[in-house]
């Protein structure tokens, strides 16, 4: 593989995470405006975003097998066509059914693209370099989470319709589409090089179960938290801009944390530092949820920084539970995380409807505590140390 080709594939991976981050995180900013657009209460409107999350979940789950049937480049180019159709559907229709369909299509495109992006990184990089590359790739998720709420706040404050936010997000996929030209992708399945030796099948082990539960609870907790921070902040008397700033600050700190931890993680055992970070994140979220508005800005910055490496480290540890990284194993952990994404508004929408936004934030806090327990238990069964020892000889 040429260096320029590797760079293009790496940038496709970066942008695939930015696309998913933008679609998922901007929801909290535009939800109120979309609810007004369709004359629905916010708690009811939040349920329609389950179609976005369901699309992500289904596509990531199926793509573990589709990647071996449909070439990666073909998937990405077809995804561009679907993205154009979905954004056009949002812009030119006032039907709630079509809105839900467009959201589902956006989810499918996002899930396919992100699973391809994750696979490319695990395929091109090995060992500790894989972990730091995955962490840097995931930083584009939070970079989009920092940039697009600011774009949304800018557009909405000027009474520009909410669907233009999704048109802006579509530009990320335009860049991915352009990068596919003149770029060679790894061949899988029947198109894979015949010289490759057959890979011996390995049992995944109970560590994968702990990591999968941790991935689900972490994503459900994180998105359940950040999706309702704007409503919670507005309930405390903050303006829409100030609420948007809280979300942007979280993702800015998250992004900086990823860059920092992509260097720091090289010096620590991944399972041990993951347990410490999960415990710290649970404590900091509790401080935010029970603190005063004066301290919210600082606690959300600290939470963003110290929780930034958790999800990517879970994926990296998952890929290290077998001697040879398995696309199906990585996709399984990703799928569990995406189940958390899909359940976000199913779980939190009901909680907010009955008990208000703070109850959703406290539920997210409980889920972070579960992540800590799973990471602690992983220490007794993880295989990453023996596999790292084998690869270092």
From Swiss-Prot:
Query: Is Nucleotide-binding one of the keywords UniProt gives this record?
Result: no
What does the record give under GO molecular function? transmembrane transporter activity
Q: Which InterPro entries match?
A: MFS, MFS_dom, MFS_trans_sf, MFS_TsgA, MFS_TsgA-like
Q: Which residues lie on this side of the membrane: Periplasmic?
A: 32-50, 99-100, 155-161, 227-244, 294-296, 353-360
Q: Where are the transmembrane segments?
A: 11-31, 51-71, 78-98, 101-121, 134-154, 162-182, 206-226, 245-265, 273-293, 297-317, 332-352, 361-381
- Where in the cell? Cell inner membrane
Specify the protein's topology with respect to the membrane: Multi-pass membrane protein
Q: Name one GO cellular component term.
A: plasma membrane
Q: Which residues lie on this side of the membrane: Cytoplasmic?
A: 1-10, 72-77, 122-133, 183-205, 266-272, 318-331, 382-393
Keywords carried by this UniProt record: Cell inner membrane, Cell membrane, Membrane, Transmembrane, Transmembrane helix
Entry similarity comment = Belongs to the major facilitator superfamily. TsgA family.
Q: Which HAMAP family does this chain map to? A: MFS_TsgA (MF_01044)
Protein name in the entry:
Protein TsgA
Organism encoding this protein: Shigella flexneri
């Amino acid at each position: 593989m040429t260096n320029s080709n590797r760079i293009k594939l790496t940038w496709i991976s970066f942008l695939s995470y930015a696309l998913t981050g933008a679609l998922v995180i901007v929801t909290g900013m535009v939800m109120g405006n979309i609810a007004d657009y369709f004359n629905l209460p916010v708690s009811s409107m939040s349920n329609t975003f389950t179609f976005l999350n369901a699309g992500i979940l289904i596509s990531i789950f199926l793509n573990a097998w589709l990647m071996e049937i449909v070439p990666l480049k073909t998937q990405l180019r077809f995804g561009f066509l679907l993205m154009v159709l979905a954004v056009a559907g949002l812009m030119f229709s006032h039907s709630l059914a079509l809105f839900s369909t467009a959201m589902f299509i956006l989810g499918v495109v996002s899930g396919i693209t992100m699973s391809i992006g994750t696979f490319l990184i695990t395929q091109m990089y090995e060992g500790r370099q894989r972990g730091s590359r995955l962490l840097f790739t995931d930083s584009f998720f939070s970079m989009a989470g920092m940039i697009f709420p600011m774009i949304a706040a800018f557009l909405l404050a000027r009474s520009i319709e909410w669907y233009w936010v999704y048109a802006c997000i579509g530009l990320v996929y335009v860049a991915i589409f352009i990068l596919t030209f003149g770029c060679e992708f790894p061949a899988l399945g029947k198109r894979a090089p015949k010289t490759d030796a057959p890979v011996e099948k390995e049992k995944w082990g109970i560590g994968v179960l702990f990591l999968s539960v941790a991935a689900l609870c972490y994503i459900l907790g994180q998105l359940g938290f950040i999706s309702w921070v704007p409503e919670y902040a507005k309930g405390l008397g903050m303006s829409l801009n100030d609420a948007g700033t809280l979300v942007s600050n979280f993702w800015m700190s998250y992004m900086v944390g990823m860059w920092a931890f992509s260097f720091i993680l090289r010096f620590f055992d991944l399972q041990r530092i993951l347990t410490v970070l999960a415990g710290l994140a649970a404590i900091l979220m509790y401080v935010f949820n029970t603190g005063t508005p004066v301290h919210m800005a600082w606690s959300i910055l600290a939470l963003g920084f110290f929780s930034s490496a958790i999800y990517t480290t879970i994926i990296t540890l998952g890929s290290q539970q077998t001697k040879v990284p398995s696309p199906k194993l990585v996709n399984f952990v990703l799928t569990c995380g995406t189940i958390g994404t899909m359940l976000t508004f199913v779980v939190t929408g009901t909680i907010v409807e009955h008990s208000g936004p703070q109850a959703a934030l406290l539920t997210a806090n409980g889920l972070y505590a579960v992540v800590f327990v799973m990471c602690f238990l992983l220490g007794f069964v993880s295989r990453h140390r023996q596999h790292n020892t084998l690869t270092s000889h």
